[in-house]
């Protein structure tokens, strides 16, 4: 039976929903306590779900064309669905210890060994808050040495508007043409090769790695083909078992501020999270971290460095940066910029571009090219200010407690003296949204009071569709459609704000933007936060308006 491309996603969705109903309605699956006592039950359920996902990933879409749109469609078919994620969470199984073995095997199948990636002279960065900004700062500094380093690769996640943002060269996302070219080179190599089913029983012919693993493979392939002289890699989640940890010999490693996030995968204590982050440390590659780490976390990081036979150095905020206007706003970015200085220094010294490393001292002298690199760093949706018509938008994709406090403090301090109306646009679909709103509220009060508060979904368009690059299958579609999270946020806000602000709920980002434009004739300051998906969707909406 031939399944057309247009009908395929609908059939998949229907099958998933029916499977979920069967499982959840079954008596054994409806009692959570039985998960803890019946190991066979847990294994059976996850295995069923695992096989089902293989059915989805096996030949996800047979592509007729090989355009950028075709590549995005194929890539989206590799996402894990919400029901499967929740099923695995219910088992309490945090670790996929096969990840790195699988990455080595996938790499072999596309023509590489892990040692091939050593030529990329990699900076490997992990952390909870600020690792993307630190990666951007580091890349921008290295980009000032174009004669010696003509091409600098940068791999980050997630993306805001286009998946191409994850794979950059000299600070710019690769073109749609190059993305499609390299994407299908990897895709076709995987199709034309096989794995030993004795060693990898789930790697059946036609199967593909998941979304993030595929993009990680694609980044290595792209940077090697483009002859990048140095690359900056941001960890996806954690470090120890992250797909990027196939990197065997980084030049230097960095750890930004630690906090509580991704607890299902990393653990719910700072110690557990630090242990995972420290998993990227490698023998012979010095490691640096920001100052003012949580003491318990710093202790674990030091232990991990000793275990991996390397050094860990705390980086103070450099005094020379105190009066420098960084390309990414926010006072807290000074520590990320300082860390980036040390990471770039290691790369440039190892490459014989700097005669001496920069001293890790607050009074150290920083070269002018480093300062220019920090000033010229561009990183959308992190403490970003945009003027649109009569309104000023303050945008930050904060989605953890610490980042929310930092972003909210930045907004408060920036608009404290402004007499404009204040509007909040917020969403967080998969974490504890109400806790984040409480962090936001306590950070801006009492200096800032919002006149209007809008809770929206991450759906891009009022037609109910997403921008193709922003399709996400890891949230509950039922919750999105019924606006469950948004209605809960309204109740919570009215309680903590004593019903002072007018609250609104919209089903899409486009509708939220249209509502904001009609609320007041006078100018307003608008704070957008809670989710990088929300921020990315808003920027896509802005782009369409600008084209019109």
UniProtKB/Swiss-Prot annotation:
Residues bound to Mg(2+) 1: 157, 234
PROSITE patterns: FOLYLPOLYGLU_SYNT_1 (PS01011), FOLYLPOLYGLU_SYNT_2 (PS01012)
EC code: 6.3.2.17
One annotated Gene Ontology cellular component of this protein: mitochondrial inner membrane
Entry-linked SUPFAM superfamilies: MurD-like peptide ligases, catalytic domain, MurD-like peptide ligases, peptide-binding domain
Subcellular location: Mitochondrion inner membrane; Mitochondrion matrix; Cytoplasm
Coiled coil: none
Pathway: Cofactor biosynthesis; tetrahydrofolylpolyglutamate biosynthesis
Record keyword Nucleotide-binding present: yes
Residues annotated for Mg(2+) 2 binding in this entry: 262
Keywords: ATP-binding, Cytoplasm, Ligase, Magnesium, Membrane, Metal-binding, Mitochondrion, Mitochondrion inner membrane, Nucleotide-binding, One-carbon metabolism
Main location: mitochondrion
Needed cofactors: a monovalent cation
Binding site for ATP: 130-133, 382, 396
UniProt xrefs under InterPro entries: Folylpolyglutamate_synth, Folylpolyglutamate_synth_CS, Folylpolyglutamate_synth_euk, Mur-like_cat_sf, Mur_ligase_C_dom_sf
Details of cofactor binding: A monovalent cation.
Enzymatic class: ligase
A molecular function (GO) term: ATP binding
UniProt record, GO biological process: one-carbon metabolic process
Reactions mediated catalytically: (6S)-5,6,7,8-tetrahydrofolyl-(gamma-L-Glu)(n) + L-glutamate + ATP = (6S)-5,6,7,8-tetrahydrofolyl-(gamma-L-Glu)(n+1) + ADP + phosphate + H(+)
Membership in a protein family: Belongs to the folylpolyglutamate synthase family.
Function field: Catalyzes conversion of folates to polyglutamate derivatives allowing concentration of folate compounds in the cell and the intracellular retention of these cofactors, which are important substrates for most of the folate-dependent enzymes that are involved in one-carbon transfer reactions involved in purine, pyrimidine and amino acid synthesis. Required for methionine synthesis and maintenance of intact mitochondrial DNA. Involved in telomere maintenance.
Protein name: Folylpolyglutamate synthase
Native source organism of the sequence: Saccharomyces cerevisiae (strain FostersB)
